[in-house]
A protein has these predicted regions:
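A shared catalytic/ligand-binding motif for oxyanion handling
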Residues: 1-149
Length: 149
């Protein structure tokens, strides 16, 4: 967890790395146990595609995945990449064992902070089976108004 500020506005970045087995339950537990504030961004490998578009095989999502999506929605969180790219099939992970691609690495943010997210993109990596995700945020500098001037 990283806590800091950008342009005098607090931000918390939380990294999650879910296990391969039990990922859905782990992520759901982590999300519900966190005190998700408006300026909290959750990043990491959750080992779960959240939509059929997040798999090269376009499989239906499981009931457990829908439960996780419901939890994300109840916590007023959004999948920032999918929000910015609702129709784009782009992946963060290649499974050489299965010969498939998926987007199992995610950045989640609070719905109320949507205006602070400028752009998001997946950056290819040649050194890892996972690609990086870059999120640009747009925090406006606060101006101080002085009525005595």
């Amino acid at each position: 967890m990283i806590k800091g500020s950008i342009q005098e506005e607090d931000i918390t970045i939380i990294n999650i790395h879910a296990p391969n087995i039990g990922a859905l339950q782990y992520v759901r537990y982590m999300l519900t146990s966190m005190k998700g504030e408006i300026n909290t961004v959750i990043v990491g490998d959750i080992n779960t595609p959240l939509t059929p578009m997040d798999r090269s095989t376009k499989q239906k999502i499981k009931k457990e995945t829908q439960t996780l999506n419901d939890t994300i929605d109840q916590l007023d969180l959004i999948d920032i990449y999918r929000t910015f790219h609702p129709q784009t099939m782009n992946f963060t992970f290649f499974s050489s064992a299965h010969g498939t691609f998926s987007r199992i690495d995610h950045i989640l943010g609070h719905k109320a902070s949507l205006g602070k997210f400028k752009k998001i993109k997946i950056i290819p990596s040649i050194f890892s089976e996972h690609n990086a995700i870059r999120l640009d945020v747009n925090y406006r500098r606060k101006t101080i108004k002085n009525s005595n001037i």
